[in-house]
Amino acid sequence: MADTPAEYIQHHLQNLVYGSHPEKGWIIAQTPEEVKAMGFWAVHVDTLGWSLFMGLIFITLFRMAAKKAVTGVPSGLQNMAEMCIEFVQGIVKDTFHGKNPLVAPLALTIFVWVFLMNSLKWIPVDYIPGLAHAMGLPYFKIVPTADPNGTFGISLGVFLLIIFYSIKVKGVGGFTKELSFTPFNHWALIPFNLFLEIIGLLTKPLSLALRLFGNMYAGEVVFILIALLPFYVQWGLNVPWAIFHILVIPLQAFIFMVLTVVYLSAAHEDHH
C-alpha cells in the first residue's frame, strides 16, 4: 500500500473519493491530485457508506429490542436499549426546557449513532484499508467522524433544526427581534447586535463539527503513528491508547448530544 512512512500516513488518512474529473469524467480518485481536481462536489464514499451502515445497525438493534420487549426478565439487548433511553431521557429532562416530544428521540439517535461511528476506531488501522486494497480500492477510511465532511453533515442538520425551531417558536419577527436586540436593547446598536448574534449562531455547528472531528482525527493519527513502530513496541502503546479511547469515544458522542440539546433548548426559549 505504501513504501515510506509518509506514504503510509497519507494513504491511511485519504478517503475513497468518487467525483467528476475535468479530464477523466466520473471516476474513483486514485491520487490526492485527482481528488483536488474533482472539487467540492466529490463524494467521500467510505464516509457516506459507513455512516449509513452504522445508522442501519442502530435502527436494527433498537427495533429488535422493541420487538423482543417482554414484561418478565428482559434480554441483554433490551437492557442495553433501556439503559440508553433512560440515560438520554434524563439528560433531556435536565437540559431541555421546552415542550417538544421529538427532542429526546433526536438526542438518542445522535448519541448512539455518533458512538457507533466513533467505535469503528477500535478496529486496527490496517485491517479494513488492507482488505480494500486487496479488492482494488486505492484508499478506504472507516471512521466517518474522522472526516470533516461527516461531522459537518451532522452539525448542519442540527443547525437547520435550530433555525427551524427558532422561527417556529418565536416567529420570524420574534427571531429577528432577538437577533437585533440581544445583548444590547437599543436600536442604535442593532448592527453590532446582528454581527454578534449571527457569528454566535454560525459558530454552533462549526464548534460541534470541529470538536468531534478534531478528537477523532487526532486519535486516528496516533493509532497510525503507533502502527509504524516495530511490532514489539506497538502492543505496549496500542493497548493503553485503545483503553483511553474507551472513555474518549462515548464522551465525544455525549458532548455532541448534550450541546445539540442545549442549542435546541435555546431555540425554544421565547423572550417576548
UniProtKB/Swiss-Prot annotation:
The keyword Transmembrane helix appears for this protein: yes
CDD domains: ATP-synt_Fo_a_6
PROSITE patterns noted in UniProt: ATPASE_A (PS00449)
Family under the similarity heading: Belongs to the ATPase A chain family.
Transmembrane segments: 39-59, 103-123, 124-144, 152-172, 181-201, 221-241, 242-262
Organism whose genome encodes this protein: Ectopseudomonas mendocina (strain ymp) (Pseudomonas mendocina)
Topology term for the membrane: Multi-pass membrane protein
Protein name in the entry: ATP synthase subunit a
GO biological process: proton motive force-driven plasma membrane ATP synthesis
Single GO molecular function: proton-transporting ATP synthase activity, rotational mechanism
Subunit structure: F-type ATPases have 2 components, CF(1) - the catalytic core - and CF(0) - the membrane proton channel. CF(1) has five subunits: alpha(3), beta(3), gamma(1), delta(1), epsilon(1). CF(0) has three main subunits: a(1), b(2) and c(9-12). The alpha and beta chains form an alternating ring which encloses part of the gamma chain. CF(1) is attached to CF(0) by a central stalk formed by the gamma and epsilon chains, while a peripheral stalk is formed by the delta and b chains.
Keywords assigned: ATP synthesis, Cell inner membrane, Cell membrane, CF(0), Hydrogen ion transport, Ion transport, Membrane, Transmembrane, Transmembrane helix, Transport
Subcellular location, record wording: Cell inner membrane
Cross-referenced InterPro entries: ATP_syn_F0_a_bact/chloroplast, ATP_synth_F0_asu, ATP_synth_F0_asu_AS, F0_ATP_A_sf
Pfam families in the record: ATP-synt_A
PANTHER family in UniProt: ATP SYNTHASE SUBUNIT A, CHLOROPLASTIC (PTHR42823:SF3)
Domain of life: Bacteria
GO CC terms: plasma membrane; proton-transporting ATP synthase complex
The protein's role, per its UniProt record: Key component of the proton channel; it plays a direct role in the translocation of protons across the membrane.
NCBIfam families: ATP_synt_6_or_A, PRK05815.1-1
